[in-house]
């Protein structure tokens, strides 16, 4: 979650410099739940609050930054998931994928994937929305890159270029 926040702050700062209006759901390491007596209830509240922000303005475009993890360490590379509810989501996902591939990961052959019902935020977003899994923290080499400030800047820039190519 620290990596997600570091990259998302860099992305928001960059997009602001390029003239985009940005809004981050969180700028520090804390959830955005408003209710719940246990972890599950707080997680549900957190997701509903995020979705409410996403869908609050039809002009919003959502890029949610995440990291991937798998039981085997051989997997690497950015992967982008997109909401099935807005056709612009697929275009945004593909543009980000191409940008990251061109600038950072020329050997990355991962394709964009339409989110299934298990990805609550994308399943319920009405605005263009993507989740960008920047890399695999279960891959030692990639995890080291993701922790590097310069690499984070490059990742944020590649994602920003992907957005700017569509919007």
Q: What residue spans do the PLM features occupy?
A:
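Active-site-proximal helix/loop segments of hydrolytic enzymes
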Residues: 2-167
């Amino acid at each position: 979650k620290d990596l997600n926040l570091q990259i998302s702050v860099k992305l928001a700062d960059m997009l602001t410099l390029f003239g985009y209006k940005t809004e981050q759901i969180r700028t520090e390491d804390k959830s955005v739940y408003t209710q719940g007596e246990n972890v599950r209830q707080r997680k549900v509240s957190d997701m509903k609050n995020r979705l409410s922000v996403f869908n609050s303005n039809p002009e919003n475009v959502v890029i949610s930054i995440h990291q991937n993890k798998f039981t085997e360490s051989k997997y690497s590379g950015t992967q982008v998931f997109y909401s099935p509810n807005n056709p612009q989501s697929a275009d945004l996902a593909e543009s980000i994928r191409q940008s990251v591939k061109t600038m950072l990961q020329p050997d990355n052959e991962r394709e964009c994937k339409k989110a299934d019902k298990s990805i609550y935020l994308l399943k319920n977003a009405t605005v263009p929305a993507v989740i960008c899994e920047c890399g695999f923290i279960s891959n030692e080499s990639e995890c080291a890159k993701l922790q590097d400030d310069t690499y984070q800047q490059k990742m944020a820039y590649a994602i920003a270029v992907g957005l700017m190519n569509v919007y």
